[in-house]
Structures are given as structure tokens and as C-alpha cells.
């Protein structure tokens, strides 16, 4: 009987902890729409998006950008990110 109660309490604690971490994780991501202009051109590969993510992260601290994209124009490239960890 004691083992059953301990098992049930353990399961309840695990469920509560998992639920708490899911709520905390959901609150961290915010829509941020960060944009900035940088020198150079976009290469159409994963490196261009990563470079944009790194460049915007340097300019907009403490936000950590996510879902970034790059567009080339005459004077350089426009980087924009849709979501951020704050």
C-alpha cells in the first residue's frame, strides 16, 4: 500500500514538473520582427540565414532571434527575424 501511494505521488510530481516547464518554454518565445541592413549579399542557403541571425543578435541584445531570413538589395542585405527568445 505504501509503495502504491509513493508511486502515485511520484507520478503526480512528474506531471506537474513537465507541465510547468512547458508553460515556461511557451512564454519565452515572442514575436519580435527585428530588421536591419548589413553589408554584403545574401547567398541562398542556410548560411545566409545563420549569418543574419548572428548579425541581428549582435545589434539587438539581449534578444536572441529565431526564424531569420535575408534579402539582397542595391546597398547590401536586409535581415529580418520573426521570433525572439527574450
From Swiss-Prot:
Keywords: Disulfide bond, Secreted, Self-incompatibility, Signal. Disulfide bonds join 32-84, 42-70, 52-79, 68-81. GO terms for cellular component: extracellular region. GO terms for biological process: rejection of self pollen; signal transduction. Coiled coil: none annotated. Belongs to the DEFL family. Involved in male-mediated self-incompatibility. This is Defensin-like SRCA-homolog protein. It comes from Arabidopsis lyrata. The gene is SCR37.
Amino acid at each position: 500500500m505504501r509503495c502504491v501511494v509513493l508511486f502515485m505521488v511520484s507520478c503526480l510530481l512528474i506531471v506537474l514538473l513537465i507541465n510547468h516547464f512547458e508553460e515556461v518554454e511557451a512564454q519565452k518565445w515572442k514575436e519580435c520582427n527585428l530588421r536591419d541592413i548589413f553589408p554584403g549579399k545574401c547567398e541562398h542557403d542556410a548560411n545566409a540565414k545563420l549569418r543574419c541571425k548572428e548579425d541581428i543578435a549582435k545589434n539587438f541584445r539581449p534578444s536572441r532571434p529565431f526564424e531569420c531570413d535575408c534579402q539582397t538589395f542595391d546597398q547590401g542585405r536586409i535581415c529580418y527575424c520573426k521570433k525572439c527568445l527574450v
